[in-house]
Amino acid sequence: MFCVQCEQTIRTPAGNGCSYAQGMCGKTAETSDLQDLLIAALQGLSAWAVKAREYGIINHDVDSFAPRAFFSTLTNVNFDSPRIVGYAREAIALREALKAQCLAVDANARVDNPMADLQLVSDDLGELQRQAAEFTPNKDKAAIGENILGLRLLCLYGLKGAAAYMEHAHVLGQYDNDIYAQYHKIMAWLGTWPADMNALLECSMEIGQMNFKVMSILDAGETGKYGHPTPTQVNVKATAGKCILISGHDLKDLYNLLEQTEGTGVNVYTHGEMLPAHGYPELRKFKHLVGNYGSGWQNQQVEFARFPGPIVMTSNCIIDPTVGAYDDRIWTRSIVGWPGVRHLDGEDFSAVIAQAQQMAGFPYSEIPHLITVGFGRQTLLGAADTLIDLVSREKLRHIFLLGGCDGARGERHYFTDFATSVPDDCLILTLACGKYRFNKLEFGDIEGLPRLVDAGQCNDAYSAIILAVTLAEKLGCGVNDLPLSLVLSWFEQKAIVILLTLLSLGVKNIVTGPTAPGFLTPDLLAVLNEKFGLRSITTVEEDMKQLLSA
């Protein structure tokens, strides 16, 4: 096992990365190794998808499957070894079908890629794990060095984050052939074990630029189906009655669940990154979407144990449900998996609803505590002139984009302290689950404009980027000249690709934490600092002073 893709990875003087029987996320060495094997199979599939496009062949089954299967290897998504192998087998079957299509056009069609003809050696998981050793990401570290390995992983993990957003967009009916062609090209190239530093740096920026387009179609999919989010108050306390909790990012799953629970007497609560759903008109119209439950994903083993109903996980993040003894009432959807947990193959939630009706639910309603969400792209752009007016009248000094992933590390309290230290004449724009560090606190307003503005899920960084570009255009300056600072927390691969997106767009002087990615060497961090001004957090006092004086 070698996995260094998330923020909580093991860090030692000898090197970084989880390489024992189990990773810090709970992933076993078996599952981790089989995920490496799956990635190799997906690289071979992409190599043939690139070749097929040369013949004008676009296989939509391949295009829809490839990012979805890659998504299953993202942190805290799928811990089920047999399902990972199932994805690998499907990748090979699709590859062979695509290969046959190519050969039907050109009998001499071939692909020069070491993954292009990969076959699984056995049905036995142990044998497959031994085969996977050929594809462990650091297998040639001694030959290429830590810097090249780090750049490879930056590209691989960044592309994995983009693949997750591609799947979210695809579920909502969004498809862009150019994006899929670019994805396959990059995925196939990474399967050749590239070792050119400049080419890898260029690839990382290409991934960032591609992901901006992915976020654009995801935004179109969400707003096209569910309307543009508008500011909405959400209750974060319990309401009496039977209940279901839904977590993850998939708004379509939430919509289907709301439709199927309507009139059943079962209330629905959002959790984690599903919180922004309350801002969408076509979702909040369901009166039994009664509120948001819990806090950051890392607290789920305590909070889920206390929730008196079933739980549905639609995407990341799931962690071991046996710890809180709720594994008999947690359900996985789509690419999510945990051994022994019931999985919903389709969009029928009747079994979950039946379980909810058999459980006690909340016995009484607590005193409501309301927070505000729903500052989507249209709302943000509608406030652009107000922001400019406040800045011109020196009522608004600075805007801090304070968001990203949450996690268990104690140093993450920095983000709570930073939020509460932001001066009263400054505004906090937040997104993603890092907001749970401070989103239940009171921040007041500046002439009626809330000082805490919740823009949505991690992918809604797109809205923040569009706002920044709009403000810069209206003020006749560059984005980096705005009174705007980005202080981002990271945990997994979606955050990595958001960072690459920002860097590829030329955004500079981003501050990240709580620690630097374990796969980035001091040399690589120095390069990123020199090129983009990217740096790690220090103390709240020092960072606040530096950012306000910039």
Swiss-Prot record:
Co-factor(s): [2Fe-2S] cluster; hybrid [4Fe-2O-2S] cluster
Chemical reaction(s) catalysed: A + NH4(+) + H2O = hydroxylamine + AH2 + H(+)
Organism superkingdom: Bacteria
Major localization listed first in the record, in broad terms: cytoplasm
A Pfam family assignment: Prismane
EC annotation from Swiss-Prot or TrEMBL: 1.7.99.1
Leading EC class: oxidoreductase
Binding site for hybrid [4Fe-2O-2S] cluster: 249, 273, 317, 405, 433, 458, 492, 494
Protein's UniProt keywords contain Oxidoreductase: yes
Residues where [2Fe-2S] cluster binds: 3, 6, 18, 25
Family: Belongs to the HCP family.
Protein name: Hydroxylamine reductase
Gene (name only): hcp
